[in-house]
Amino acid sequence: MAGRQRLEFPVGHVLYQTTGWISHPRVSPKGDQVAFLDHPTYMDDRGVVSVVDLAGQKRVLSAGWESEEGLAWSPRGNEVWFSATETGLQRRIYAVDLRGHLRQSFSAPGGVTLQDIAPDGRLLLTRDEQRSGIMGSTPGATRERDLSWLDWSLPIGLSPDGNEMVFDEQGDQGGPTYTVAVRDLRGSPPVPLGGGMAGGFSPDGKWVAATINYGQLVLLPTGAGTSRRVDSGGIQQYGHPILWLPDGKQLVFSGELAGRAAQCFVQNIEGGKPRAVTPEGVTWCLPSPDGKWIAARDLATKQGRLYPLDGGEPRAVPGLMPGENFTWTSDPKFMYASQGGQTSVKIYRLNIVTGQRQLFKEVTPTDVTGLCGLNHIILSADGRSYVYGYTRLLSDLYLVKGLK
């Protein structure tokens, strides 16, 4: 279903659906319930532990987890075991019974992730060394520079001149709401701006849009000044990216109204009601450099389309492949298109009128040990500066006996 994920058991019988995402579904030993991790925001693993019966009655067993990965039923089916943390990255093993009584079962330095539980009670788990970092380059540079800050840095956007990057720090030191920071690509230390998840730079570079816990939209000054709150206008949850129109007075973002799937909106920073510019289920909203179009992705088809900001029928983007990431160049007739990869990514310059594609750049890190993928590939409008994120995971597998 557009804009929603569904949990089915058996196949075709819908038990639960959400505008967020579902992970680690496990059927109970009796086959009468499904336990799963329920994440309210796409690509963020914070969330709750839930169970749903075959009639579709869902219950939350444990909530408030900043990161949750891995879940399994106990052999008797009286508890759900999972790995999670309330802050940072170092997950522990917890057990919760069907009445919501929670207990900690196991922890280890560096954190662990539950993989499975055997019928005799033995646990299969991994001890993980995880890191999310940022690499980038500027005009004239002979090699890429590591622009990471702490242990979980995610690039979000580049300044209009391509010299600065705004990013999130989401790891152990990022805090419960994460931290928004900026950094000069040429080597200056990071400068924290405040709590939240970052959006883009304003056209004059003086502000960065951000959200706090996905529910409050704020503007953070990049220099002296105080932050500003923007009225939600009925938006229950914000998605990313959050970008500016060229006039510097309006923001473009994906958001969810009560009971609705995510869609793209435009809103004046002085407040007022957000205006929907795409149907539900269409997100990843990128304004064109002339402010006339919103490029966005249909979650059902994974296909990018162009939506006129002033209304009218959307149009296809010839040459853009389903699932490809895209961003605008400084010329509204062209886009950069790329597909995330594990160890390398090819970036194409795409003529959105003719569909002609030309290889523009290939990104390949020098150290591919433990790489899980490259993501968040961001280019300046002129294509001369770029940054990208990488995730590295090194794991040791353990069999644990004797836990109760």
Label the model's feature ranges.
Residues M1, L15-H39, D44, K58-S83, ...:
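Conserved beta-propeller blade repeats
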Residues M1-Q17, V353-E362:
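Short, solvent-exposed linear motifs at loop/edge-of-secondary-structure regions
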Residues G3-E8, D44-S50, G88-Y94, R131-G136, ...:
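Structural motif
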Residues F9-G12, D53-Q57, D97-H101, T138-T142, ...:
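Short loop/turn segments that connect beta-strands within beta-propeller blades
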Residues H39-Y42, T85-T87, D128, P139, ...:
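Short polar/acidic secondary-structure junctions
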Residues L123-L125, S132-R145, M165:
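An edge-strand/N-cap motif at the start of beta-rich repeat modules
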Residues S344-L393:
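C-terminal closing repeat unit and adjoining cap/tail of repeat-based domains
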